[in-house]
Amino acid sequence: ALGSAINPAAISYRLKLLKDMGCDAIRTSHNIPSPELARQCDSLGFMLLVEPFDEWDIAKCDSGYHPYFNEWAENDVAQMVRVFRNHPSVVLWGIGNEIPNQLDNDGWRTVKRLQDVCHREDPTRPVTVCMDQVATVLTNDFARDIDIPGINYRTHKYYDAKATWTQGMILGSETASTVSSRGVYKFPVKMKLGATYDDHQSSGYDVEACPWSNVPDIDFELAER
């Protein structure tokens, strides 16, 4: 592999922009980040969720991680933890995002196996899996052993998750996904999901979201309850 080059000044610039807008946490979706990102997060006071891959042994795309998962997953997760465990900015390990194995009744076995690797290499930090098939994982065993279950969108399932899972905490691992076009205003102003228009633009009033998501106002309301 050729690897990649990074620009520390560019990382610093981006982090300071985020900090200026009030951001204090970053999720490295969905790949292992550069050590330089973790170093600068240490310096600037960010919290960091580090995760290694976007799929397990079931493909989500032709060029994904699935051909290597069975042979390399445990090693790659262990190496990830060893590289980043001494960074104070790291508060959480991730071991999967929107994994198709959520629909598998045996998916919990892989969760436990990878989580055990994280605990072995670093017993001080919790582990999450970020899930989108929330209705399914509320009825099978996929999420039963996850330290802190993560929910992608599906805010209407938060209360069901809290009542069903015994961990006592859930993570909003992906939340609002609003779409807008600068300088374009649609009337009448209405909240819409997956809206399409002949001019291929969205309303600039921040009232439209992707079909799988919601506008930020929903998250703000939940946070205030």
Regions found by a protein language model. Give the residues of each.
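Active-site-adjacent substrate/metal-binding segments within catalytic domains
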Residues: A1-K112, P123, V127-T128
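Structural motif corresponding to alpha-helix initiation and N-cap regions
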Residues: S12, E74-A78, T136, T155, ...
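Short acidic loop-to-helix transition motifs that present clustered carboxylates
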Residues: I32-P35, M131-T136, R154-K157
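Substrate-binding clefts and catalytic carboxylate motifs of secreted carbohydrate-active enzymes
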Residues: V91-W93, R109-C130, D141-A143, K157-R225
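Short hydrophobic/aromatic-enriched beta-strand-loop microsegments
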Residues: G45-P52, D147-Y153, M169-T175
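Glycine/Thr-rich phosphate-binding loops of Rossmann-like dinucleotide-binding domains
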Residues: E36, L103, V137, Y159, ...
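Short active-site oxyanion
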Residues: D24-I26, R144-P149
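Catalytic metal-binding/acid-base residues of hydrolase active sites
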Residues: F53, G96-P100, D132-Q133, R154, ...
